[in-house]
Amino acid sequence: MGERKAVIKNADMHEDMQETAVHTAAAALDKYEIEKDVAAYIKKEFDRKYNPNWHCIVGKHFGSYVTHETQHFIYFYLQERAFLLFKSG
C-alpha cells in the first residue's frame, strides 16, 4: 500500500469512526477496482462494525443531497475518488 492522504471535505462523525472510514476505503481500493465493489465493501464493513443501515457512494463525478443520522456522515477524497458514507434508516 503506497502513501495515501485522505482529504475530508465534510464530516458529522467521531474522529475514530472517520479514521475507520478512511482505512476501510483504502482496504477496499487495494482489494477492488470497480467502484461499485469498493462501495459495497465499505458499506458491508460499516454495517458489520456499526450496525445497519449504512449507504456508500464512490466515484469521480457525482452530486448528492442526503439525510443522515447525527454523527454518522463523512464525505472525503482518497486516491482521486470521492467517498460519501452515511447512515440512514
UniProtKB/Swiss-Prot annotation:
Listed GO biological process terms: microtubule-based process
Record PANTHER family: DYNEIN LIGHT CHAIN (PTHR11886:SF35)
Which family does this protein fall into? Belongs to the dynein light chain family.
Tell me the GO molecular function terms. Answer: dynein intermediate chain binding
- Location(s), subcellular: Cytoplasm, Cytoskeleton
Q: Where is the signal peptide?
A: none
Q: Which GO terms describe its cellular component?
A: cytoplasm; cytoplasmic dynein complex; microtubule
PROSITE patterns xrefs: DYNEIN_LIGHT_1
Q: What is this protein called?
A: Probable dynein light chain
Q: Which Pfam families match?
A: Dynein_light
Its main localization is cytoplasm
Report the SS bond pairs.
Answer: none
Q: Reply yes or no: does the keyword Zinc apply.
A: no
Q: What organism does this protein naturally occur in?
A: Schistosoma mansoni (Blood fluke)
